[in-house]
């Protein structure tokens, strides 16, 4: 039964493409704590490095997460939860990627034994659509100081400013995380590195399949 639940969740997550809140704007905004990507001489985006490793914009989200030495625990959790296909396929997604240290605070049960709960936790870190720093700032401004981001798990992450230059995320339990590295661009979305784990509410939800 648990395998069926996980498989069903993963399949639904893979189908959640598009429909993100807000849109990328051409308007200029103040830079955030991390420097924005620069352009190389050929006009291609250059991503920030993670743990000394290059994050190539021509890769998909899963490939860059796998390449990051700071996200080995996240890679294992994504594989166990069955969400890897969603992050290497088509569509556009935003991933809020907790570091190994952030995930080390979770109990062993959450990371290994309860696969259905693990799938929910991983799906809560993924938002349909491309929310780079500019799009996040736009959504926060349009939301009167906060943006509610619907995740593929079905829950909501709240984004708001933490001081003049940083975005803070709050989960459904009231826990918060800062974005430590912004705007790691991939061919199927964008990744932001976060310094704490964010979790959905305990109550199970039905994941939308469209």
Where are these regions (language model features)?
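Gram-negative bacterial Sec-dependent N-terminal signal peptides
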Residues: 1-25
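Mature, structured domains of secreted/extracytosolic soluble proteins
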Residues: 22-210
């Amino acid at each position: 039964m648990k395998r069926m639940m996980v498989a069903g969740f993963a399949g639904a997550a893979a189908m959640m493409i598009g429909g993100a809140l807000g849109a990328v704007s051409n308007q200029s905004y103040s830079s955030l704590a991390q420097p924005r990507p620069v352009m190389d001489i050929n006009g291609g985006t250059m991503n920030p490095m993670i743990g000394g490793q290059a994050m190539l914009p021509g890769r998909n989200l899963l490939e860059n997460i796998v390449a990051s030495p700071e996200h080995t625990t996240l890679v294992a959790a994504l594989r166990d939860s069955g969400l890897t296909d969603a992050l290497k396929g088509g569509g556009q997604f935003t991933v809020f990627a907790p570091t190994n240290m952030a995930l080390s605070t979770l109990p062993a049960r959450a990371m290994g034994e309860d696969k259905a709960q693990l799938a929910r936790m991983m799906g809560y870190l993924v938002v349909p659509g491309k929310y780079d720093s500019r799009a996040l700032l736009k959504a926060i401004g349009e939301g009167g100081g906060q943006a509610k981001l619907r995740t593929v798990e079905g829950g909501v992450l709240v984004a708001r400013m933490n001081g003049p230059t940083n975005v803070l995320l709050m989960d459904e339990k009231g826990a918060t995380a800062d974005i430590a590295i912004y705007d790691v661009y991939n061919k199927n979305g964008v990744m932001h590195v976060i310094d704490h784990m964010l979790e959905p509410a305990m109550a199970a939800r039905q994941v939308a399949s469209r």
